[in-house]
């Protein structure tokens, strides 16, 4: 599928088509597929307990969450990313179809409009709050940071995971209609950046390093003490960084209130889930918490990418 090919020939008239067909004729659109293993996969059912990474465990209770079981956990994770949502959906649909009778679908989310930059060539996108998101995210070209914060290395107790990463997902609902009624100055103080420019409130341009010691004309912190960028910064968290690759989402309209349902489908990769836990705990006092709420959560161990002749699970099951 990542090469734009059919799963199999669609020629037998008296059998279901091997490929569902909706992406026939579509370009590959930079399709990538990532596989992850959840903590529960390593329980007594499959004899994999001895191969469970020590760092892989269900996330502990964290601030500002009320998790819905319908969007939480899972034994396996499939993430398909593409410039064409149809191509991504085709990949997930056909992989799920192959697992019919063996796996049970737990939850699925369709994201749109990435919410962070991952390469230096990308312009910073905006989230549903209207702010630029991911300005200080790790970039793929920063190999030292990728090795230091994203890729699992020799520190793991499981050789099959070396070169892979841990994936954390959080479905974060945003109360967009309440946010839209807030004053611009309040919005900027909550985030810690200018809404249009993306520059930190301490001054400069979007990519100016925030000065968390700067004061405004009244002698108050230019970036408020509870601003999102302050509490989430690596300076505030002992140097902790993660690679964010999230998307916006919408679930339509709340049938009970008539309000818009949408928010951030947070996705991040890291060397150890403890990195995310530290950052999320630091956000307990985030001023943004008035407008967002975590309703889904999962963590997975993702093995490294495949080379020719390799297959998913090869390192884990052999």
Predicted regions and their residues:
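Long, histidine/aromatic-enriched segments associated with O2/redox biology
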Residues: 1-318
């Amino acid at each position: 599928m990542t090469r734009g090919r059919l799963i199999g020939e669609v020629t037998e008239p008296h059998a279901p088509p091997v490929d569902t067909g909706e992406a026939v004729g579509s370009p590959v659109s930079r399709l990538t597929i990532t596989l992850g293993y959840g903590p529960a996969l390593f329980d007594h059912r499959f004899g994999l307990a001895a191969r469970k990474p020590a760092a892989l465990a269900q996330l502990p209770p964290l601030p500002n969450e009320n998790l819905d079981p319908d969007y939480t956990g899972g034994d396996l994770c499939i993430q398909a990313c593409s410039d064409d949502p149809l191509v991504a959906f085709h990949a997930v649909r056909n992989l799920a179809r192959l697992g019919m009778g063996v796996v049970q679908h737990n939850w699925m989310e369709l994201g749109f409009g990435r919410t962070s930059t991952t390469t230096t060539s990308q312009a910073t996108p905006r989230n549903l709050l209207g702010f630029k998101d991911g300005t200080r995210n790790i970039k793929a070209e920063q190999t030292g940071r990728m090795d230091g914060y994203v890729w699992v290395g020799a520190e793991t107790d499981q050789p099959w995971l070396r070169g892979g990463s841990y994936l954390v997902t959080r479905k974060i609902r945003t109360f967009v209609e309440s946010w839209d009624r807030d004053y611009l100055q309040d919005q900027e103080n909550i985030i810690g950046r200018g809404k249009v420019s993306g520059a930190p409130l301490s001054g400069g341009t979007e990519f100016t390093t925030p000065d968390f010691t700067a004061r405004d004309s009244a002698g108050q912190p230019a970036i408020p003490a509870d601003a999102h960028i302050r509490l989430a910064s690596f300076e505030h968290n002992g140097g902790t960084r993660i690679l964010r690759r999230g998307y916006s989402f919408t679930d339509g309209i709340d049938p009970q209130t008539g309000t818009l349902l949408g928010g951030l489908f947070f996705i991040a990769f890291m060397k150890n889930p403890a990195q995310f836990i530290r950052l999320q705990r630091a956000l307990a006092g985030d001023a943004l918490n008035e407008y967002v709420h975590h309703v889904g959560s999962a963590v997975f161990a993702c093995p490294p990418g495949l080379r020719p002749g390799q297959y998913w699970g090869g390192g884990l099951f052999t």
